[in-house]
Amino acid sequence: MKRTYQPSNLVRKRRHGFRSRLATVGGRRVLANRRAKGRKRLSA
C-alpha cells in the first residue's frame, strides 16, 4: 500500500510556499494571522 505522504520539495514550495500564499486572498489571510501571532516562519 502506498503511503499518503511522499515528500517533494518542489510540490511543497508550490502548494505551501510564500508566493502561493500571496497569490490568493485566503493565503494572504493566513500570512496575516501568522504575522499577528508572531510566527518565526510564515510559510514553507
From Swiss-Prot:
Coiled coil: none annotated. GO terms for molecular function: structural constituent of ribosome. Residues 1-21 are annotated as: Disordered. One of its GO terms (cellular component) is ribonucleoprotein complex. Signal peptide: none annotated. Keywords: Ribonucleoprotein, Ribosomal protein. Pfam families: Ribosomal_L34. The keyword Ribosomal protein applies. Gene3D superfamilies: 1.10.287.3980. Belongs to the bacterial ribosomal protein bL34 family. This is Large ribosomal subunit protein bL34. It comes from Rhodospirillum rubrum (strain ATCC 11170 / ATH 1.1.1 / DSM 467 / LMG 4362 / NCIMB 8255 / S1).
